[in-house]
Swiss-Prot record:
Name by which UniProt lists this protein: D-alanine--D-alanine ligase
Native source organism of the sequence: Mycobacterium bovis (strain ATCC BAA-935 / AF2122/97)
Signal peptide bounds: none
Any one GO cellular component localisation term in the record: cytosol
Cofactor remark from the record: Binds 2 magnesium or manganese ions per subunit.
Length: 370
């Protein structure tokens, strides 16, 4: 094989310090199964919940949910390593003691399959920019904005895009008064402001439930957002940047959760998503063509409004008055049930092609200011 024919070396980075560690592992397992080994030389770097980087054996079978048991990157499961924040090192991953400084691998591009804080929020993107290593997905700004539900809504609203009503509790305040939320009406959803996978989310149907819901959310994030419940269909759309910088939007998907587990107040929570297999996912969604196209265009506008790059999943409610944007996920789930790859498959882009496009776009973009 000539130098021009050599495979692109991709580091799939997963796990991390957030409470979405396990879902990141499952996403990584799915990606490892679907990367084209003829084109890509793949290494797998796990980050433990404590933050140590470990070179793993890239076994996707170890990164699955089995009998409701969640996967985890464990200390001692491989050689500990680091990525020096030095662009002169050319993407080198070096060992930590013993053998400190030994170059273990050199990579061309990083696929940071990290969900939640300390990964999806601009932190690893900043490290990769400092290290001069191209990476899949949004840059520092869009990653940070997309992780914070408050600032996502603020930027979208400033660009004239439809968002729901909300209230925010920020440190050092410890309580959110009922009067601040009454304008939202009931029910409301109380969430960690910088989190995903529906972890720490509560549905509040009585104001007496608000303090407990805030306390639950604060176990995951000191900043809490309270969102007005929106009556409508839950729709999602994938946005994908091509290597030439053009943007494409996928067919839509719909999540239906009414009556899940026999509860009238059910919503698409963590257990429904990943453990119970209880929600119904329709891909493509059964939506009028004109409405679907309008939502796809809104997804592209939202992507541009936060200066996103690479990919994103934009979540909507379709109400009687039209679509409302709920949030933007700059590194959506890539599990076998995740909507993002399923929507692109329904659009005619299979999983290996989708992953290859993301990597090609990352290499074409490079690093630095754009």
């Amino acid at each position: 094989m000539s130098a021009n024919d050599r495979r692109v070396r991709v580091a799939v980075v997963f796990g991390g310090r957030s409470n979405e560690h396990a879902i990141s592992c499952v996403s990584a397992g799915s990606i490892l199964r679907n990367l084209d080994s003829r084109r890509f030389d793949v290494i797998a770097v796990g980050i433990t919940p404590a933050g140590s980087w470990v070179l793993t054996d890239a076994n996707p079978d170890a990164l699955t949910i089995t009998n409701r048991e969640l996967p985890q990157v464990k200390s001692g499961s491989g050689t500990e390593l680091a990525l020096p924040a030095d662009p002169r090192r050319g993407g080198q991953l070096v060992s930590l003691p013993p053998g400190a400084g030994e170059v273990l691998e050199s990579v061309d591009v990083v696929f940071p399959v990290l969900h939640g804080p300390y990964g999806e929020d601009g932190t690893i993107q900043g490290l990769l920019e400092l290290a001069g290593v191209p990476y899949v997905g949004a840059g520092v700004l869009a990653s940070a904005v997309g992780m914070d539900k408050e600032f996502t809504k603020k930027l979208l609203a400033a660009d004239g895009l439809p968002v729901g009503a909300y209230a925010v509790l920020r440190p050092p305040r410890s309580t959110l008064h009922r009067q601040e939320c009454e304008r939202l009406g009931l029910p409301v959803f109380v969430k960690p402001a910088r989190g995903g996978s529906s972890i720490g989310v509560s549905r509040v149907s009585s104001w007496d439930q608000l303090p407990a819901a805030v306390a639950r959310a604060r176990r995951h994030d000191p900043k809490v957002i309270v969102e007005a419940a929106i009556s409508g269909r839950e729709l999602e759309c994938g946005v994908l940047e091509m290597p030439d910088g053009t943007l494409e939007a996928s067919t839509l998907g719909e999540i239906r959760v009414a009556g899940v587990r026999g509860r009238e107040d059910s919503f698409y929570d963590f257990a429904t998503k990943y453990l119970d297999d209880a929600a119904e996912l329709d891909v493509p969604a059964k939506v009028d063509d004109q409405v679907a196209e309008a939502i796809r265009q809104l997804a592209i506008r939202a992507f541009a409004a936060i200066d996103c790059r690479g990919l994103a999943r934009v979540d909507f409610f379709l109400t009687d008055d039209g679509p409302v944007i709920n949030e933007i996920n700059t590194m959506p789930g890539f599990t076998t049930i995740s909507m993002y790859p399923r929507m692109w498959a329904a659009s005619g882009v299979d999983y290996p092609t989708l992953l290859a496009t993301m990597i090609e776009t990352a290499l074409a973009r490079g690093v630095g200011l754009h």
